[in-house]
From Swiss-Prot:
Gene3D superfamilies: Kelch-type beta propeller
Taxonomic placement: Eukaryota, Viridiplantae, Streptophyta, Embryophyta, Tracheophyta
InterPro entries linked to this entry: F-box-like_dom_sf (IPR036047), F-box/kelch-repeat_ARATH (IPR050354), F-box_dom (IPR001810), Kelch-typ_b-propeller (IPR015915)
Protein's name in the database: Putative F-box/kelch-repeat protein At4g39760
Name of a matching Pfam family: Kelch_FKB95
Length: 369
């Protein structure tokens, strides 16, 4: 028989994350949805440091817990360089009312990202063939570098010859064997504001000077069709003819936004959202979205595919007209029963960030991190 004196006495210990090994804390945080990260950053300096590091993304990739996130690229008058913002969505956010849609305070926000996010996730890149080329970065030591992944494998990261000038937030587009890089440097760089990299010869060549008007504006987007590079800046759109090596102003070539969801192509154009009927080759209007008109004051609207749902982003004036607010709506798409139409069902709508009147909306994208 065991006496009472021999019975081990349990002791209550107060355990905390700070007492755990660092790698265990990283592993735990990597398993948590990114929707909770804004509040977790407020828990402790340790949590904030891990969440804002590249370490957490390596762990999420290893554990298979990566999520699709929406990033927005803005130019604010108070900052020297454009800034990336991430859309933080409250977990299980959805409208519960079945009545008329009204403006609601969703709690969803566009949160500015520190440079550590920018460098690790959002550096300019382009896919050419089986290789992904990463151009520049947010570190002075890397801002003139070009790296590439062979066959999509990170462990085969290699370095190509450096650009003529360092670039931060450059815009790139590629069509084998060339990669075109523009902007991201001082506007006085007339000789090297734009460069082209030849993959075959592994050499850089400067592009003709487009002039101070082009160099003085931020490049929002670029796309390439056949021999032409289409460049969209803050105020105008331009065409660079790669064969003639000439620049010219063109009509707006980015006057609509598009995305693909479950093999269906969607565009926002002429104040409406449309989908392409591949059988008839006709563009058809998405039904059920007329209510959005009262929330919009601009023709400039971006749409993206976020986990199979249509996300719309735009801006509008505040009541005082002294600022603007960026708005966002998440829409679930449903095919009509017994017909060939598509309905849009709002899940939430609200303003996510206040910005100065003089800001510029540059771009948005969805990235798996």
């Amino acid at each position: 028989m065991i006496s009472q004196e021999e019975v081990p006495q349990s002791t209550n210990h107060s355990l905390s994350f700070s007492s755990l090994p660092h790698e265990i804390v990283v592993s735990c945080l990597a398993r948590v949805s990114g929707s909770y990260y804004p509040k977790l950053c407020l828990v402790s300096k340790q949590f904030r440091s891990i969440i804002l590091s590249n370490e957490i993304y390596k762990a999420r990739s290893h554990l298979g817990t990566k999520e699709n996130r929406l990033f927005v690229w803005l130019k604010l008058p108070t900052r020297s360089y454009p800034s990336w913002f991430a859309l933080w969505i409250k977990p299980n956010e959805t409208l519960t009312n079945d009545g008329p849609i009204k403006k609601q305070s969703t709690g969803n926000l566009l949160v500015p990202l520190p440079c550590s996010y920018n460098y690790q996730v959002l550096v300019p890149s382009v896919i050419v063939g089986s290789e992904t080329y990463i151009v520049g970065g947010y570190d002075d030591a890397l801002s003139s570098s070009v790296w590439f992944y062979k066959n999509g494998k990170i462990h085969t990261l290699s370095k190509s010859p450096s650009m003529s000038v360092a670039r931060i937030d450059a815009v790139v587009v590629g069509q084998y064997p060339n990669i075109y890089v523009m902007g991201g440097c001082d506007s006085d760089e007339s000789m090297n504001w734009g460069e082209v990299f030849n993959i075959k010869t592994q050499t850089w060549e400067p592009l003709p000077d487009p002039g101070p008007e082009v160099r003085g504006q931020l490049v929002r987007k670029m796309k390439m069709q056949k021999k032409n590079v289409y460049v969209s800046s803050e105020k105008k759109d331009y065409i660079y003819d790669t064969e003639e090596r000439t620049w010219k102003v063109t009509e707006a070539v980015f006057n609509f936004s598009w995305c693909v969801i479950e093999k269906v192509r969607y565009i926002y154009y002429n104040k409406n959202c449309w989908w392409l009927d591949t059988k008839s080759k006709d563009w058809r209007k998405i039904k059920g979205l007329d209510f959005l008109n009262k929330f919009r004051e601009t023709d400039r609207i971006e749409i993206v595919n976020l986990d199979g749902k249509l996300v719309m982003i735009w801006d509008r004036f505040t009541l005082s007209k002294r600022n603007k607010k960026i708005w966002c709506a998440m829409i679930a798409l449903e095919k009509c029963q017994g017909c060939e139409g598509i309905w849009g069902k709002i899940e939430w709508i609200g303003d996510v960030l206040m910005v100065p009147l003089s800001y510029s909306f540059l771009d948005c994208m969805v990235i798996s991190i």
